[in-house]
Amino acid sequence: MAQTGTERVKRGMAEMQKGGVIMDVINAEQAKIAEEAGAVAVMALERVPADIRAAGGVARMADPTIVEEVMNAVSIPVMAKARIGHIVEARVLEAMGVDYIDESEVLTPADEEFHLNKNEYTVPFVCGCRDLGEATRRIAEGASMLRTKGEPGTGNIVEAVRHMRKVNAQVRKVVAMSEDELMTEAKNLGAPYELLLQIKKDGKLPVVNFAAGGVATPADAALMMQLGADGVFVGSGIFKSDNPAKFAKAIVEATTHFTDYKLIAELSKELGTAMKGIEISNLLPEQRMQERGW
């Protein structure tokens, strides 16, 4: 039987990242820039989402050499992505000793029917969600941390805003319901009934929910924090900008001081050009990464 980390320990590890910024990096140099800027963790991968989107084809787990290079370069936690449903990619990353695994829609799904049973792993998992149904299904499978799916690699915050608002609105609805209404709501959402009961009792999700997918500026990061995010993932936004080190520090500061508008104004000055954005309506249905997973 596989050894498993306890739910409390894995969720506690995710709670420790609360209020922070997690940055995508593709090598040791970028990882050091992220750490020096104040990132609470880094996500090691071969290509940032914008490049994955541009290249097309099948996107897989990163070469273990890249993941190890990043792990050896920094003292902060290191995450890595596995394809949805790819048991062996996840086991390989766990064996390598990564701190978290992201079962990610940014990569090409390996299984179109089943997500990983994340309860069987010692390593904590982060998963994307667009609504409370997706959020609770991932938690039931063992996710210790959630993030909005947004629309990765676009530099467009609109989908992350939509997903964060939707999850939070649905949580408020569940909290306001009487217990005898919850079973029907569970059916409508495709959500485990016991988890909805817990959300009603606690008044919140049982795990942290970060913003991700389209964060490109300090103001974007601050916006997501104001909407109730527990922290921020930045994928392409930093290392696709003109001045990655400056952008990274500015996004960390804006995430921490998300209601200090004068500071955010100062942080936003002379940053250089942000990453080139993509209008969501211009994406074909098969190009929408957020549609992956169920």
From Swiss-Prot:
Induction: By superoxide. It is an enzyme of class 4 (lyase). It comes from the Bacteria. Its EC number is 4.3.3.6. Disulfide bonds: none annotated. InterPro entries: Aldolase_TIM (IPR013785), PdxS/SNZ (IPR001852), PdxS/SNZ_N (IPR033755), RibuloseP-bd_barrel (IPR011060). Changing residue 149 to A: No activity, does not form covalent adduct with ribose-5-phosphate or ribulose 5-phosphate. D-ribose 5-phosphate binds at residues 24, 153, 214, 235-236. Homohexamer and homododecamer. In the presence of PdxT, forms a dodecamer of heterodimers. Belongs to the PdxS/SNZ family. PANTHER family: PYRIDOXAL 5'-PHOSPHATE SYNTHASE SUBUNIT SNZ1-RELATED. This is Pyridoxal 5'-phosphate synthase subunit PdxS.
